[in-house]
Amino acid sequence: AGGGLFQPIDTSSEVADLQITDVVMRTVWDRSGTLDGRTVRVTGFVVHDVDAVHVARVRIMCCAADAVPVKLRIEGPALAEFADHETDSWVEVTGEVVPDSATAANGHVPTFVTESVRAVEPPSDPYEY
């Protein structure tokens, strides 16, 4: 199901490969719960903030001038593994988003309970659209 506003998620696999933008948008706007209990895999670059670790991408809506970062706050069993990954290094993470965790108060940044993380090569196009 796609929740009306979103394309349906492929249910033929146990893990849904999604863009970080899609995870953020669904967490903020999709009231039908299409991500609830779903294992999701995303690719992004690591951001070590003062009080948190994030996986992020840069989203371009129209042109580079309107580029904005989109990110997931990393929690869960694999959080400690992020110490092995420097800021700006690229990773693939698998886990579940915490329902209703992206709020105006936290800048619409969902919490992502990460089960696994692995280093990957940067994509040929690092942006999301």
How does the language model describe each region?
Residues 1-129:
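OB-fold and OB-like single-stranded nucleic-acid-recognition modules
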